[in-house]
């Protein structure tokens, strides 16, 4: 009895005798690709910072792993996930979106603060890729930094719309012109990954007092929002010698930002606003 086999061609069903091997186009493609999987291994070494606070006496160290790039995705985060899934389940790091949106996988890779999900693996097999947690932060475990202080500073600037007349809150929209909305471009895109703040020497030295580039850029974002009524009050909170003025325009923040933003410029704009604010305050 003849069998009915559906072909990938548009000519409809094709009758074939039983026992005759049928090879679909996808199988042919897989067969053609087979030699590639047998290519010579490309072994890449990753030296990763390790420290486990739950192990008494454990000291920070670098642990080396070898990954075949032929069997790994192209990004550093792909390598970390492969290491954790297939070699060492104790390796700890943060990650979520895998597309440069959430900021979770911020770490120091080959000397620069960046996102592991958006940085390609250096394919030079003679070089060891070195991965550390964000610098000058307390470490929770391995590549996980403690961001408690960073988030507390962000909370302190009240990063939300504030209105002095709240009678219409929830009843109508707070409209904004196209021109005023355009002023927020390059500011609202910040994902709070902390790459910029942890690359700033001033923040290393005064993290308990200096707000740092990420938080200051968000402070500026709300200061210039035409819908916000608390610009003067926001400026007043930065009057002390440390919150704002520890910025020495080193510009590491702008160089390292994985989103291509310019926190240094935002801080400079706040300083300009502060000058006019002081003049207004003195005249009162």
UniProtKB/Swiss-Prot annotation:
GO CC list: mitochondrial inner membrane; respiratory chain complex II (succinate dehydrogenase)
Q: Which residues bind [3Fe-4S] cluster?
A: 200, 247, 253
Q: Where in the cell is it found?
A: Mitochondrion inner membrane
Q: Which organism is it from?
A: Xenopus tropicalis
Entries under SUPFAM superfamilies matching the protein: 2Fe-2S ferredoxin-like, alpha-helical ferredoxin
Binding annotation for a ubiquinone: 205
Q: What is this protein called?
A: Succinate dehydrogenase [ubiquinone] iron-sulfur subunit, mitochondrial
Q: Which cofactor does it need?
A: [2Fe-2S] cluster; [3Fe-4S] cluster; [4Fe-4S] cluster
């Amino acid at each position: 009895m003849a069998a009915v086999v559906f072909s990938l061609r548009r000519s409809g069903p094709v009758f074939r005798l039983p026992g005759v091997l049928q090879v679909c186009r996808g199988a042919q493609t897989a067969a053609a690709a087979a030699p590639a999987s047998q290519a010579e291994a490309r072994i890449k070494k990753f030296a990763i910072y390790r420290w486990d606070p739950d192990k008494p006496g454990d000291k920070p160290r670098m642990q080396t792993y070898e990954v075949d790039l032929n069997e790994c995705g192209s990004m550093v985060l792909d390598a970390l996930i492969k290491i954790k899934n297939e070699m060492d389940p104790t390796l700890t790091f943060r990650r979520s979106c895998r597309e440069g949106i959430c900021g979770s996988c911020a770490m120091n890779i080959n000397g620069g603060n960046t996102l592991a999900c958006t940085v390609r693996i250096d394919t030079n097999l003679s070089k060891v890729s070195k991965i550390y947690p964000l610098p000058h932060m307390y470490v929770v475990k391995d590549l996980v930094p403690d961001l408690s202080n960073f988030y507390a500073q962000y909370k302190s600037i009240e990063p939300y719309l504030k209105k002095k007349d709240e009678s219409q809150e929830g009843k109508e929209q707070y409209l904004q012109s196209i021109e005023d909305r355009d002023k927020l471009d390059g500011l609202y895109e910040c994902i709070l990954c902390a790459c910029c703040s942890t690359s700033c020497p001033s923040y290393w030295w005064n993290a308990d007092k200096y707000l740092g580039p990420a938080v200051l850029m968000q402070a500026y974002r709300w200061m210039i929002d035409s819908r916000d009524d608390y610009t003067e009050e926001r400026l007043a909170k930065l009057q002390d010698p440390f919150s704002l003025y520890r910025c020495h325009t080193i510009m590491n923040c702008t160089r390292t930002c994985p989103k291509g933003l310019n926190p240094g410029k935002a801080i400079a704009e706040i300083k300009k606003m502060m000058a006019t604010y002081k003049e207004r305050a003195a005249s009162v």
